[in-house]
A protein has these predicted regions:
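A charged helix-plus-loop insertion that forms the helical arch/lid used to bind
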Residues: 33-46
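ATP-binding/phosphotransfer module of carbohydrate and carboxylate kinases, centering on a glycine-rich
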Residues: 1-19, 28-32, 53-62, 78-89, ...
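A short acidic/small-residue loop/turn micro-motif
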Residues: 43, 114-117
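Short glycine-rich anion-binding loops that position phosphate/pyrophosphate groups of nucleotides
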Residues: 25-28, 94-98, 203
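General beta-strand structural signal in soluble alpha/beta enzymes
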Residues: 63-69
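Short beta-strand-to-turn element immediately C-terminal to the catalytic PLP-Schiff-base lysine
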Residues: 76-77, 100-104, 108-110
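Short beta-strand scaffold segments in enzyme catalytic cores
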Residues: 90, 97-102
Length: 246
């Protein structure tokens, strides 16, 4: 972090850096700036990240602000998309399931159609939580169940498909995923009155395998909503984090 921050601050040249926006994965105390994660950034669990960043940069602690990485993604997607959506839902699909609800460019953690805390990863679903059904873990387990082949991540499935191996199995898995993802999202899209759904994260690289089915699942329920892929998730997250300091 020290090296990366130093390089960024050097690029600013003579321009004064008046704030620092940081996007972090949950769980994290975004008010106090305390790391809490067991499995992500475990080496800094309990650390006052705000204090450490102040020590490294000299930036006023009151101007070092934190947000959830999924919230950063949503705010960045809204900004990079021209800010035309009034009610935008952003989701990141990969090793986890991040979500955010954006109202006129602002991150919403409560309100009509917004889940508690504005997050969906732990939303109760089929006796478990939503993340269990839309993360890469689900793909790994489903592919192993069907084919007997162990994989890590989704990319090996795509590679098999392009090598004309397990093509029917891969298609069936993505079809099931699209239906399940639509089932999770539909009530929130409807109650929130979303006019755009933006999808980012590692899974978006496989959009051709599930976006058409996802759109069709929404249309079958009478929901017409643009489903947009944000391939450069990192840039969107950084843009959203930077927006905290405006």
């Amino acid at each position: 972090w020290d090296s990366a921050l130093g390089a960024c601050m050097q690029k600013a040249g003579a321009r004064a850096i008046t704030g620092l926006g940081v996007a972090m994965p949950s769980p994290f105390d975004f008010i106090k700036g305390i790391a809490m994660a067991e499995h992500k950034f475990a080496s800094i669990k309990g650390m006052n990240v705000r204090a450490e960043l102040h020590r490294l940069t000299g930036i006023d602690p009151s101007r070092i602000l934190f947000t959830n990485d999924a919230a950063g993604f949503g705010m960045g997607a809204w900004s990079l998309g021209g800010g035309n959506a009034r009610h935008l839902i952003g989701v990141t699909l990969g090793t986890g399931f991040g979500a955010c609800f954006i109202v006129d460019g602002c991150y919403a953690t409560y309100g009509p159609g917004v889940p508690i805390g504005g997050e969906l990863w732990d939303y109760p679903f089929r006796g478990r939580i939503a993340e269990d059904f839309v993360s890469t873990r689900w793909f790994e387990e489903k592919f192993r169940q069907i084919t007997g082949v162990a994989i890590t991540g989704v990319k090996p499935m795509i590679d098999y498909y392009h090598a004309d191996k397990y093509t029917a199995e891969v298609r069936a898995i993505f079809d099931e995923f699209a239906r399940t993802f639509a089932e999770i999202m539909l009530p929130f899209v409807q109650r929130f009155g979303a006019d755009t759904l933006v999808v980012g994260g590692g899974m978006v690289r496989a959009e051709e395998f599930f976006f058409p089915q996802l759109r069709a699942a929404f249309e079958q329920k009478g929901v017409q909503i643009p489903v947009v892929a944000m391939a450069d998730t990192t840039t969107a997250i950084i843009a959203g984090a930077a927006a905290l300091c405006k």
